Amino acid sequence: MKAQGMLGALALALAACGGGGGTGGGPPPPVSLPSVDTAPVPAADPGSALPANWQYGGILEIYVRGYQDSDGDGVGDLAGVTQRLDYVRDLGVSAIWLMPITQSQDHDHGYAVSNYREVETQYGSLADLDTLVAQAHARGLGIILDYVMNHSAQTHPAFVNSSNAASNAFRDWYVWSSAHPTGWSIYGGDPWRSASTGWYFAPFSATMPDFNLRNAPTVAWHKDNLRFWLNRGVDGFRFDAVGNLFENGPGAWEAQPENYALMGDVRALVGGYANRYMVCEAPADPLGFGAGAACASAFAFGHHTDVVNAAKGQTGAVAALATYFAAVPASMATMVSNHDSFAGARLWDQLGGDVARYKLAAATYLLQPGVPFIYYGEEIGMSGAASLSGDAALRTPMSWTANPANAGFSSATPFRALSANAATNNVATEQGDPNALLNFYRSMLALRRAHASLARGSMDGASASGAVLSYRRTLGAEQTLVIVNYGSASAAASLSGLTANASYLAQWPSGVGDVTASGSGDASVVAPAQTVLVFLRAP
């Protein structure tokens, strides 16, 4: 029997055995419950329009609500993102990660999903998404979607059904207890929430109940949802909160063995489509989830703080950067900040607006191994909003122009306050300035695109000496040499392990001399203060 039919029968049964009748003595009317779209979705791979290993070119994270408003309602939308695709292409990234675009209860960040197969009404329609995907592919850009498997919205039809009675067809889709479990504390609070039919598990918020992923029909439904989007041509997913998928007790609610197994299963599904990519968010165990048996790519939490601290000149962080990729997969997703305040403020605010150090941070993660993720506006040095705090301060309208009313984001009043530095740090102002952050990001991404060793090569000979980091990137016959001086004074980098007698031709910045290795593969290079140098071994 289909789930909707089961629910209808259950509602009638509850009404018949009912209780609480009115003065007329007749049975109460049947409970009206929303339907749940559980239609199976078979795989129908449309193929891939992208080159192999496309993700290593870099991915721009976009908060759709805050990127570009196309229809004058003060809220960003999918059509607005489509309008800005030429800008994204010219930035030099290879793909876009869209923060949640599905219908949600929160109508803001989108992580309280109320419909997994429909687009948020303010963002547009499925047709708008199809247009965005097609236009992105025409420009060589991929599109990955945010997917929330851990929890749904409280208003999701499955949870409305699940919470209707202590026994129903969707009860096991969520985590329930008849009595209030004790001894639990997650994120400083009790994760169990009271409802009329019991207690449900919702550590993030009462409005975001956790799915019961031990329930096979729930997992099968999620897989159908993934195929729904993959069949439309999206190029992969970013999976939210994968460390929270299963709980085995008050002291065992994060990064449980079942989490890794399920994500490995999901990876197999995504990998069944040509040339797709997935990345997972798991701050508690990035390396575990980044392993091939699980997600095969995860955000490198911890590394991102080393990048920022190295840019500040902290030598301990410089040393950590020299060793990180010796022990982790090259598929780890690197970043300096994102949409969550727990990952840090906007990079501009973390570095106090120091442009030289900002460029060092950018060069560090854009030239090292990994899949680099750039948070929208990072490339122009957007700050947070002075009038806001927490996550909202990080999710402001994109600063396209210096217009004090809307920063070029909308013809109407924007849904949220602008970034504090929108008047100075905006695309229009920086476009024509060769020294601006925007053009520095373009240059670093162009280097990564021009030299495959910088995108996908090994990282060898990494050495940290005080505030100077040096390493080689090698892929096949191509080898690049990178030297970064995070210090406030020029310093010599003593290099070894180079190809004997080889010439290393300067690629960045202009005006730097070439380097020639000795017969034993050694060289010494003086790096100016707060500078990145890039060389390419001559063929």
Identify what each model region corresponds to.
Residues 518-539:
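C-terminal beta-strand-rich structural cap/linker in extracellular carbohydrate-active enzymes
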Residues 18, 33-223, 227, 231, ...:
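Acidic/aromatic-lined carbohydrate-recognition and catalytic surfaces
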Residues 497-512:
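Solvent-exposed beta-hairpin/edge-strand motifs
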Residues 14-16:
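C-terminal motif of bacterial Sec signal peptides marking the signal peptidase cleavage site
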Residues 50, 54, 270, 277, ...:
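Loop/helix patches that line or flank the sugar-binding groove of alpha-linked glycan CAZymes
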Residues 255, 486-500:
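Surface-exposed beta-strand/loop patches in extracellular or lumenal glycoproteins
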Residues 18-25:
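Bacterial lipoprotein signal-peptidase II cleavage site
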Residues 153-163, 279-312, 383-392:
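Substrate-binding cleft/loops of secretory-pathway carbohydrate-active enzymes
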